[in-house]
Amino acid sequence: MTNNAAAPLYSLRGLPLIGWRDMSHALNYLFADGQLKQGTLVAINAEKLLTAEDNPEVRALIGAAEFKYADGISVVRSIRKKFPQAQVSRVAGADLWEALMARAGKEGTPVFLVGGKPEVLAQTEAKLRTQWNVNIVGSQDGYFTPEQRQALFARIHASGAKIVTVAMGSPKQELLMRDCREVHPHALYMGVGGTYDVFTGHVKRAPKIWQNLGLEWLYRLLSQPKRITRQMRLLRYLRWHYTGDL
């Protein structure tokens, strides 16, 4: 019998990554025995592995997160190459966030949203309430000063949120989640980057066929040619992958 509440770990470049078989497995893992796990979720793709390799602070932030999972198809392929018996599939961060919100709405789990432009955040809240009846106990857009951080953490703690999602981009969101956990430790935190923009239709995601073929990165590159410099960094990751240096 398969244990859906457990998941193997696979090490890439010294970082242990959770190997989920599919979205159902991910949700059963996070809500094992009906209890939502506490800690920090971090989506790992090739670009994030490269940044962690070059930036000790980012590596420490990622390393400290309890739940690191394979978000990028290149990372999934590397796991399968290094561990041929691995039954692991890509769980995209944007999809996991939506599934988590749907589950939270069903179970009445209190949610606090952080990040995004004010209008995008407001639309995100409205859509979450309408679509899944999510119990949003507070929110804060991404426009606040360093001096306002502690007040935000106090608000999150007072809200009793069990899920806190932060859309600020990496590593800003990881830094904020780390610091907020010192004030409000008993929650599941998730860094979600530009997910609110995609969810509300402000940014178009790659069509499903591109996603299924593992070409979402190419779609983004064609849509945003200025990303070419960032994509060139991935040649280094390809060297790791094909030389087995993972």
Swiss-Prot record:
GO BP, one annotated term: enterobacterial common antigen biosynthetic process
- Which pathway does it take part in? Bacterial outer membrane biogenesis; enterobacterial common antigen biosynthesis
Q: Does the keyword Secreted apply?
A: no
Give the function comment from the record.
Catalyzes the synthesis of Und-PP-GlcNAc-ManNAcA (Lipid II), the second lipid-linked intermediate involved in enterobacterial common antigen (ECA) synthesis.
- Record-linked InterPro entries: UDP-ManNAcA_Trfase_WecG, WecG_TagA_CpsF
Write out the entry's keywords from A to Z.
Glycosyltransferase, Transferase
Superkingdom is Bacteria
Keyword Cytoplasm belongs to the record: no
Q: What is this protein called?
A: UDP-N-acetyl-D-mannosaminuronic acid transferase
Which terms in the Gene Ontology molecular function aspect does this entry carry?
Answer: lipopolysaccharide N-acetylmannosaminouronosyltransferase activity
> What Pfam families does its record include?
Glyco_tran_WecG (PF03808)
What is the similarity comment for this entry?
A: Belongs to the glycosyltransferase 26 family.
Reactions this protein catalyses:
UDP-N-acetyl-alpha-D-mannosaminouronate + N-acetyl-alpha-D-glucosaminyl-di-trans,octa-cis-undecaprenyl diphosphate = beta-D-ManNAcA-(1->4)-alpha-D-GlcNAc-di-trans,octa-cis-undecaprenyl diphosphate + UDP + H(+)
